[in-house]
Amino acid sequence: MADQRKAALDNALRKIEKNFGKGSIMRMGDAADTKIATISSGSLAIDEALGVGGYPRGRIIEMYGPESSGKTTVALHAVAEVQRRGGTAAYIDAENALDPQYATALGVQINDLLLSQPDTGEQGLEIADALIASGAVDIVVVDSVAALVPRAEIEGEMGDTHVGLQARLMSQALRKLSGEINKTKTIAIFINQIREKVGVMFGNPETTPGGRALKFYSTIRMEIRRGEQLKNGTDVIGNRAKIKVVKNKVAPPFRKAEVDIMYGEGISKTGELLDMAVEKDLVNKSGAWYSYGNERIGQGRENAKQWFADHEDAMNELMNKVRVAYGMEPDEAPATKEGEPQQETIEEASSDK
């Protein structure tokens, strides 16, 4: 009986491969590498919260939160990280609000960034579809879902009602995009805003525009909220961003990260490095003093951050120690300064394209 079942299964597999091509069905363990390929988010704290050391390739990521919470900043750091590793990035700026100077300050090579500012939601999603289908783009950012206005709404009058148009548009687009994203191993980041449902008496009244489709298709959903202000004396120089991974299909969800977002600079890498190193006793904190190795590096958190900013070799050494301590792989991508040529280091991770 067992032999008959095995023969029937083998016959079915041969028939499927004949009709749909080799590789259309396989045993899961037959894949050359079952480990999930990732690209760093550009932030140690976010990489740790994601559970796999970065954003998984070939998956959809949704970032949502209130206004000025840091969503675009987090997405731009991912773009900069892809470019630093020699990859290609595209940005669909539906809000028409991308600041080239700020993007450059975050490490984005704007001369190499593919930018589109579409007139309608359909146009923006079709452009994203073409870029993803090419297999030559490593990351596509859509900023934002709420700004993907359907063509019928653009061409209509101000008072016209268009019930569910955007939700249908997103549902149709994601049905098509999800397969291509997985096949080409492209990271697709959708930035979204927050709305409030009217008349909700109990529970959370907050929701995100674009219907339910994006919630279902997303492998990771990140909630980004603004925390307390960061001050230098009386001057406000930045704010804390609180990030919660509310959905994660590749690691345990509900992990949290907090990062310093400095105005004009983006995420403070020295700040998150210092916090994570202290937590793992790689940097000693005694009172207000911080010590690394046998050297006292500063009194107060800001002075310790500045010491690492001034000592790049020590910072890179500690960064790899922290990654190992948190179960992540050391960063082997070369650190490039502004204006220096980038080296192709992303090709191995994208060899499945």
Swiss-Prot record:
Keyword terms of this UniProt record: ATP-binding, Cytoplasm, DNA damage, DNA recombination, DNA repair, DNA-binding, Nucleotide-binding, SOS response
Region annotation (Disordered) ranges: 329-353
Keyword DNA repair assigned: yes
Sites where the protein binds ATP: G65, P66, E67, S68, S69, G70, K71, T72
Subcellular location: Cytoplasm
Main subcellular location: cytoplasm
InterPro entries: AAA+_ATPase, DNA_recomb/repair_RecA, DNA_recomb/repair_RecA_CS, P-loop_NTPase, RecA-like_C, RecA-like_N, RecA_ATP-bd, RecA_C_sf
GO cellular component: cytosol
GO biological process terms on file: DNA recombination; DNA repair; SOS response
Keyword Endoplasmic reticulum found: no
CDD domains: RecA
A Pfam family assignment: RecA_C
PROSITE patterns xref list: RECA_1 (PS00321), RECA_2 (PS50162), RECA_3 (PS50163)
GO MF term (any one): ATP hydrolysis activity
Annotated family: Belongs to the RecA family.
Cited HAMAP family: RecA (MF_00268)
Function: Can catalyze the hydrolysis of ATP in the presence of single-stranded DNA, the ATP-dependent uptake of single-stranded DNA by duplex DNA, and the ATP-dependent hybridization of homologous single-stranded DNAs. It interacts with LexA causing its activation and leading to its autocatalytic cleavage.
Protein name listed in UniProt: Protein RecA
Organism in which the protein naturally occurs: Limosilactobacillus fermentum (strain NBRC 3956 / LMG 18251)
